[in-house]
Amino acid sequence: GLTVTVRGFQEPYSFDGYDLVIMGPGPGNPTEIGQPKIGHLHLAIRSLLSERRPFLAVCLSHQVLSLCLGLDLQRRQEPNQGVQKQIDLFGAAERVGFYNTFAARALQDRIEIPEVGPIEISRDRETGEVHALRGPRFASMQFHPESVLTREGPRIIADLLRHALVERRP
């Protein structure tokens, strides 16, 4: 079986000795770097990226990752709170649950970030809202895969975990 360790941002921890890190969903405003939790989340994600440690990011941490990668992040006109949508998740139609006030936006399906590598972007073609990201050693999602509104949550998590755990060279 798996061994899981849960740590709050204010607790001492190290990423050493773990096969995978899961960065949590929030709540919080991803742009308020002066807030201890948010500032810490930015530092942790930058560390995971630079050290190429496998990680999965959900909701708030997906938004912070998006900012760290240089994507545009905006407050939504109307928050998604318990909203189920069908999306294109890297070529597969999925019904997922959203609970977000902020959303990253992108105009393309793939970007190249120096020092990180190629990043695939799952997004709404009309609005540009980013649903998920896949890059070398990481995956992230704006929606909540653990929500009852996400029809195939365990499978989606498994697919994205497999992606994050496979070594890919930039």
Question: Where are the language model's segments positioned?
Answer:
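General structural signal for secondary-structure boundaries
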Residues: 2, 8-11, 105-109, 170
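Flexible gly/pro-rich beta->alpha loop and the following alpha-helix that scaffold active-site loops
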Residues: 1-56, 69
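Pocket-forming structural segment of enzyme catalytic cores
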Residues: 43-47, 54-58, 63-155, 163
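Short, hydrophobic alpha-helical segments
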Residues: 157-170
